[in-house]
Design a protein with these regions (language model features):
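Positively charged n-region of N-terminal signal peptides that target proteins for export
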Residues: 1-4, 9
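C-terminal motif of bacterial Sec signal peptides marking the signal peptidase cleavage site
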Residues: 15-19
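Soluble, non-membrane globular domain cores that form compact, hydrophobic packing
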Residues: 21-111, 117-191
Length: 191
């Protein structure tokens, strides 16, 4: 009888250790942006696109414009962040890296911005301010359909607005590239 009980306890211990071994999948996902820049995140998402989903793009800001690829945006210029990407100038001191990817013909068709928030505790506050700033914009040349704001990893905020189908493709590409992607806001802008 002691052998049977010892065997049962051993099996229970073995099963519990085995079951606990696969439980830390979230830790790897939370760190999937470690060592990445804002441009890297956009490049990784863009690389997932099929050829028939791609369109003419440009990236960067007025001083760092890149054709056919994402580009870096100067985070010390709050006015440019706001004018180009809808990022609130008052929150510029909370980020230390940014990048953009835009439809070459019309920013309202598609614009994506990635922002590295210096303190992880500020991610939600940055996302809130970004949402409010974009929702209150006066649009020219038509309204974008959707605004979606994500957190990626511990310190990145990604905002994308534009035509619904293009925004949906970007969302799929970002989630495919980064398992830590969480949707914070999904708003209709086509009032």
């Amino acid at each position: 009888m002691k052998k049977i009980i010892a065997f049962m306890l051993t099996m229970t211990l073995a099963l519990s250790v085995t079951a606990c071994g696969g439980g830390n999948k979230g830790g790897a996902a939370a760190n999937d942006t470690e060592g990445k820049t804002a441009v890297d995140i956009l490049n990784d998402a863009w690389a997932v696109y099929e050829e028939d989903e791609k369109f003419a793009i440009a990236g960067g800001d007025y001083e760092n414009m890149v054709m056919d690829a994402p580009g870096t945006v100067n985070v010390s210029d709050g006015e440019t962040l706001d004018a180009l990407l809808g990022f609130p100038a008052a929150s510029a001191d909370k980020i230390d890296d940014a990048a953009s990817l835009m439809h070459m013909m019309n920013q309202n068709t598609f614009t994506a911005g990635v922002y590295h928030v210096t303190k992880a505790d500020d991610v939600q506050a940055v996302a809130d301010a970004l949402k409010e700033n974009i929702m209150n914009r006066q649009w020219m040349c038509g309204f974008p359909d959707d605004l979606v704001i994500f957190s990626v990893g511990a310190n990145y905020v990604v905002a994308v607005f534009g035509a619904e189908d293009i925004v949906d493709n970007f969302e799929d590409a970002l989630e495919s590239s980064y398992a830590s992607t969480k949707t914070l806001y999904d708003e209709d802008l086509s009032f």
